[in-house]
Amino acid sequence: MANIINLWNGIVPMVQDVNVASITAFKSMIDETWDKKIEANTCISRKHRNIIHEVIRDFMKAYPKMDENRKSPLGAPMQWLTQYYILKNEYHKTMLAYDDGSLNTKFKTLNIYMITNVGQYILYIVFCIISGKNHDGTPYIYDSEITSNDKNLINDRIKYACKQILHGQLTMALRIRNKFMFIGSPMYLWFNVNGSHVYHEIYDRNVGFHNKEIGRLLYAFMYYLSISGRFLNDLALLKFTYLGESWTFSLSVPEYILYGLGYSVFDTIEKFSNDAILVYIRTNNRNGYDYAEFNKKGIVKVTEDKPDNDKRIHAIRLINYSSDVQHIHFGFRNTLIIDNECTNIQSSAENATDIGHYQDSKINIEDDDIIDDDDDDDDDDDDDDYNPKPTPIPDPHPRPPFPRHDYHKRPKLLPVEEPDPVKKDADRIRLDNHILNTLDHNLNSIGHYCCDTVAVDRLEHHIETLGQYTVILARKINMQTLLFPWPLPTVHQHAIDGSIPPHGRSTIL
């Protein structure tokens, strides 16, 4: 048995037990999905995403003790990149040997250009990641390069490996014309890798990838990383850390980002501002999500037990109205979290909606929210003349609902797009939906500012105008489809300013 003092001083490593349960779940998932065809709208279910997530994290956690003379002078995470360490990884060895090596046997039969089923796709990408090898069988980093001081060489090798994992997923998506299959590229493969460079090298150099309808989640993943660097210094609002691998964020963090990088909301999270964050952790029984809210800066600790694979989610919404509204859609509820129904997945700003919050529940109480009713008994015995000065009256706080810092400031509202009578019906319906989503978002924002009557009046004016154009659109559809009884629906005067849109004054738009 190792000496306890040596263990304390780190001389003898504490051996991590292999999480065989995640390997068993992975094997069952592969068997279950091996013959499931990948079609245009096929995606990986929430349960299966979390199984994949656990496998990659358990593989990382089981890395062997690193030799002092076999560490990268550049700080590269060689324990997950080289055969020297991966072949010593007990989780990796257990995975390859599990069930008489059946998973490894299946993996060896796969070719990226022949994969057509969900189980094949998952097994191929996951085994490429945990084996530390590129599609052509070459290692990410050769063992002889572990101690190399050649920064350009090491960075280029890691960038190639990171890019190839993503390129391989896009290649399969393009061949099958699939929208939502997605695994990502783990955090350690982004060592000194510029997300913007990866994004442009993949999409600018491959004409076939220009169709953003193919591989939507992959595109969203790479686009986000292209506009948000890994180490943001003074701009960072959040920092995730897992096994020494850190990543900072200044925007809301959608589930496809945390899942694709391998982070979890149960990791160490540091918060650098007093802006509120909503940490989504699981689904609930109302077809919504449960979240924990944190306002104070410092270490964020989710104290809830980790939910089961079919319920667990990973996403963080920043409530920060000083941020760039250009990227506010990353925090929209239905983009933030990957829907379990494939056809409902929203991955772009164009389709993003921020509705359904009434189905969600806050499940925690921060220390500042707790009112201490337990008075000190000694205070009751104090002499009334002990304090010669009366207790000062505190400055008044804004009236509810103003529970957070800076809530007296007006929110930034999204601009409402003008209706366009020239567009086709389908385009105008899409535009109406976009306007509704924008108004709904603005209404949610102004809901926190009950005293902002100017903004509320403006929003009411927009809503009334939208109602008029809804009637106008109904008139045109009725006439073009001959599904109308006379007289046509009447476009009433605007309830606030008494106006009628010009297109409501004639029979034809």
UniProtKB/Swiss-Prot annotation:
<dbReference type="InterPro" id="IPR009285">
    <property type="entry name" value="Poxvirus_A26L"/>
</dbReference>
<feature type="region of interest" description="Disordered">
    <location>
        <begin position="356"/>
        <end position="421"/>
    </location>
</feature>
<comment type="similarity">
    <text>Belongs to the orthopoxvirus OPG153 protein family.</text>
</comment>
<dbReference type="GO" id="GO:0055036">
    <property type="term" value="C:virion membrane"/>
</dbReference>
<dbReference type="Pfam" id="PF06086">
    <property type="entry name" value="Pox_A30L_A26L"/>
</dbReference>
<comment type="function">
    <text>Envelop protein that mediates acid-dependent endocytosis into host cells. Plays an important role in endocytic entry of the virus by acting as an acid-sensitive membrane fusion suppressor. Low pH in host endosomes triggers conformational changes to allow de-repression of viral fusion complex activity and membrane fusion within vesicles. Also plays a role in bridging the mature virion with structural protein OPG152.</text>
</comment>
<keyword id="KW-1015">Disulfide bond</keyword>
<protein>
    <recommendedName>
        <fullName>Envelop protein OPG153</fullName>
    </recommendedName>
</protein>
<feature type="disulfide bond">
    <location>
        <begin position="43"/>
        <end position="342"/>
    </location>
</feature>
<dbReference type="GO" id="GO:0019064">
    <property type="term" value="P:fusion of virus membrane with host plasma membrane"/>
</dbReference>
<keyword id="KW-0946">Virion</keyword>
<comment type="subunit">
    <text>Interacts with proteins OPG094 and OPG143. Interacts with OPG154. Interacts with OPG152. Interacts with host laminin.</text>
</comment>
<dbReference type="Pfam" id="PF02346">
    <property type="entry name" value="Vac_Fusion"/>
</dbReference>
<dbReference type="GO" id="GO:0016020">
    <property type="term" value="C:membrane"/>
</dbReference>
<dbReference type="InterPro" id="IPR003436">
    <property type="entry name" value="Chordopox_Fusion/A27"/>
</dbReference>
<keyword id="KW-0472">Membrane</keyword>
<dbReference type="GO" id="GO:0019031">
    <property type="term" value="C:viral envelope"/>
</dbReference>
<feature type="compositionally biased region" description="Acidic residues">
    <location>
        <begin position="366"/>
        <end position="385"/>
    </location>
</feature>
<keyword id="KW-0597">Phosphoprotein</keyword>
<feature type="compositionally biased region" description="Pro residues">
    <location>
        <begin position="389"/>
        <end position="401"/>
    </location>
</feature>
